[in-house]
Amino acid sequence: ELKQEAVRLVRQSDVDTFKANQTSIVYASDGSVISTLKGEKDSYYVSIEEMPVDAVTAIVSIEDKKFFRHHGIDYRALLRAVKAMVQNGEVKQGGSTITMQLARNIFLSQEKTWQRKVEEMYIATELENKYSKDQILEFYLNNIYFGNGYYGIQSAARGYFDRDVESLSLSQIAFLCAIPNNPTLYDPVTNKDNTVSRRDRILKNMLDDGKISQMD
């Protein structure tokens, strides 16, 4: 039944499913901004082509190193999460791939139960069947929460740095990508030291993976 529901949800989805509640900008004829109309969430959708390559590399390096090799589920990471659950007696968010996180953010609640985790897995598999890896990354980076009311990396770039994501430096990109794992713990306003520490970890991951050089 859970699998059938996952198939139904993803089959009914399209690109617009992942663009809901976006912020609209009203421009004057000379190109100046007249007003900004916010949806339920403060979010600006940008295509993956408009994002710096470093944004994709950074988020994959910290959230889901095996993203381009799995089909929605990282079974080893999931097994580690199960072991931790058995030891601690509670369901944690660990073990979720980028695709599973997208499934949770778009189609499910944030409830931490095993049933929800199973639903997450089914939906993630269906998402991988229907959409390309680039599409999944685009949907993810436009919908994840970056704290302080900002949904999506463009909204976060404007909110924290007053710049478009395509204009961010590598350090700024890594800084933003540090936040979604735990927007409270890594809140740049109240816990900036934590954000900076995780940013440095991301940069080290990227360096170790050969995605950037010491010169960057």
Briefly describe each language-model feature range.
Residues 1-216:
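Juxtamembrane regions of bacterial inner-membrane/periplasmic proteins
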